Amino acid sequence: MSRTVFCHYQQSDAEGLDFVPYPGELGQRIFVQIGKTAWQAWLAHQTMLINENRLSPRDPKHRAFLEAELQKFLFERNADKPEGYVAPVRD
């Protein structure tokens, strides 16, 4: 049975995540306050950040940057796209 959370990102009730997706207190906060749809939106945004900025998830500085962007994206709603980013054209 799925759980329902009030998603901070969507500002509405949403289906909750099935597991804690991130370590530590931030992971617990995400589990309690973020829905599946919002988490999928973050994963897509994170992929774009990694690709456009040529980040390595193994680099501690890059991980710190991604964690800061995660918080801005999900909880502050003010994450920016990389400079010069052009969204792909879909057919």
From Swiss-Prot:
One of its GO terms (cellular component) is cytosol. Gene3D superfamilies: Fe(II) trafficking protein YggX. Pfam families: Iron_traffic. Keywords: Iron. GO terms for biological process: cellular response to oxidative stress. Transmembrane segments: none annotated. GO terms for molecular function: iron ion binding. It comes from the Bacteria. Could be a mediator in iron transactions between iron acquisition and iron-requiring processes, such as synthesis and/or repair of Fe-S clusters in biosynthetic enzymes. Belongs to the Fe(2+)-trafficking protein family. NCBIfam families: PRK05408.1. This is Probable Fe(2+)-trafficking protein. It comes from Xanthomonas euvesicatoria pv. vesicatoria (strain 85-10).
